[in-house]
Amino acid sequence: MEYPAPATVQAADGGAAGPYSSSELLEGQEPDGVRFDRERARRLWEAVSGAQPVGREEVEHMIQKNQCLFTNTQCKVCCALLISESQKLAHYQSKKHANKVKRYLAIHGMETLKGETKKLDSDQKSSRSKDKNQCCPICNMTFSSPVVAQSHYLGKTHAKNLKLKQQSTKVEALHQNREMIDPDKFCSLCHATFNDPVMAQQHYVGKKHRKQETKLKLMARYGRLADPAVTDFPAGKGYPCKTCKIVLNSIEQYQAHVSGFKHKNQSPKTVASSLGQIPMQRQPIQKDSTTLED
């Protein structure tokens, strides 16, 4: 006499999740393990399907969504430095990159893609040590034993990729510094950043920037440049006098202040005229006289 085989539930990754009683299936409830496999497989597929974007917009979207793995200057999955816009687009749209992303996801799962960071206690630290003997995230390699892992970490390939990763950090910092210098991306006077040249142009002809320019010229006229840079102060926050450690609310107040006796007393090294003449060195005071010697 033949008996029917126990029912099985197929997991989303194609493998059988194991036998379960027919009552569980009839109730329409999946065991927790199967639900987890289905959810994980769905999320994994969504990430993998977007591993090979097409066009600039999709590439930028992928970088923004997965900044822990991809940047404008480095692909951390492939350990590749991207020194130009064309190289960046070509790399992220390549089949080779997509295959490495799939392999990376198979090893590390979804946590790295989401940028999740976990606080490690002593147990987790020991787990990390075990993971190190199983795979190398820098070189995207897996090992069959701790001996093979140790051999890899002492080899030339790992040393080369590690050096490449360290250099990429410097390239990113240099890229950020260049953006700070580029007037189409950053206004050092107002501490404002821009996404495109059109936005930058609108800022430079705007009221806020012109006000800051007026402030800068005024302070230069009254000898303020002898103090630390005016740009140290937040944009639009009054008219600061670092010498006296006060902030004036208007141009008129600032003019009156720098022309006054109190401000000049606080500036023993220079005397600036209200007409904006070049600051002159004050001679030593003798017999309570404030007369300057020629």
From Swiss-Prot:
Places the protein is found: Nucleus, Nucleolus; Cytoplasm
Annotated region (Disordered), positions in chain: 1-32, 262-294
Record keyword ATP-binding present: no
Polar residues bias spans: 267-276, 283-294
Per UniProt, location of the Glycyl lysine isopeptide (Lys-Gly) (interchain with G-Cter in SUMO2) cross-link in this chain: 114, 170
InterPro entries xrefs: Matrin/U1-like-C_Znf_C2H2, ZN346_ZMAT4, Znf_C2H2_sf, Znf_C2H2_type
GO CC annotation: cytoplasm; nucleolus; nucleoplasm; nucleus
Binding site for Zn(2+) 2: 136, 139, 152, 158
GO function term, MF aspect, one: RNA binding
Keyword Metal-binding: yes
Keywords annotated in UniProt: Acetylation, Cytoplasm, Isopeptide bond, Metal-binding, Nucleus, Repeat, RNA-binding, Ubl conjugation, Zinc, Zinc-finger
Zinc fingers (Matrin-type) by residue: 70-104, 131-165, 182-216, 236-270
Residue numbers of N-acetylmethionine PTMs: 1
Residues that, per the record, bind Zn(2+) 1: 75, 78, 91, 97
Function in brief: Binds with low affinity to dsDNA and ssRNA, and with high affinity to dsRNA, with no detectable sequence specificity. May bind to specific miRNA hairpins.
Domain comment, as recorded: The zinc-finger domains are required for binding to dsRNA, and also for nuclear localization.
Subunit field text: Forms a heteromeric complex with XPO5 and ILF3. Found in a nuclear export complex with XPO5, RAN, ILF3, ZNF346 and double-stranded RNA. Interacts with XPO5. Interacts with ILF3 in an RNA-independent manner.
Name of this chain's protein: Zinc finger protein 346
Organism: Homo sapiens (Human)
